[in-house]
Amino acid sequence: VGNVHVVADQLGVTSNARVTLVRADLAMTDVVTKDWFKTMTITHAEGTSLLDYARLSSLAGAPLTYGSEGRVELVTKTTVFGREVEAVITGLLRLNAKEQTMTLSDAKIAVAGVNLPDFTAQALLAALLRPISLRGIPLGLTATRITPAEDGVHVDLIGDNLAIGP
């Protein structure tokens, strides 16, 4: 077939992929199929996608939203001196491309409106939020870059020698 350009919504939903994408825009090169796209091999694929905060929250096991200025926010309840208080954690999303995980860095934490020192913030963040795995992106693609925005996390994708099929 040669080259194929695919723009898809809800990529991974029908295959029950671990990581589903709201939208994906992919360029595929050297696409070969012998059964009218029931199966195919793709020499190279790359493009962009959108991971919404609902799915990201599900993967993280914690409610994540967009904060501001490229930061992601986690609001959680915690107990301090026997009283339940709200903790607001904001941080920059960082991708570990080798491990295919995301973490929050440069964390800022406010508990009951009081900003915690950086060391305390990092320790609390480590206890509350583990690295978020991106393994299981549809089609065997991997993330190369992430950019948080109001509509979700924009994820650049790449894949080589992909076999797609039933």
Model regions and ranges:
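A mature extracytoplasmic/lumenal domain signature
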Residues: 10-12, 30, 78, 91, ...
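N-terminal beta-strand/beta-hairpin edge segment
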Residues: 1-55, 62, 67, 71-79
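A structural signal for short hydrophobic beta-strand segments in well-ordered beta-sheet cores
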Residues: 64-65, 91-95, 146
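Short helix-loop boundary/capping segments
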Residues: 71-120
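Short, well-ordered strand-loop elements centered on a beta-strand within folded domains, enriched
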Residues: 39-40, 44, 97-109, 154-158
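Amphipathic hydrophobic-ligand
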Residues: 1-5, 18-25, 83-90, 138-145
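Short, cysteine-centered beta-strand-loop-beta hairpins and adjacent loop/turn segments enriched
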Residues: 11-18, 79-85, 112-114, 162-166
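Extracytoplasmic/luminal low-complexity segments enriched in Pro/Gly and acidic/polar residues
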Residues: 114-166
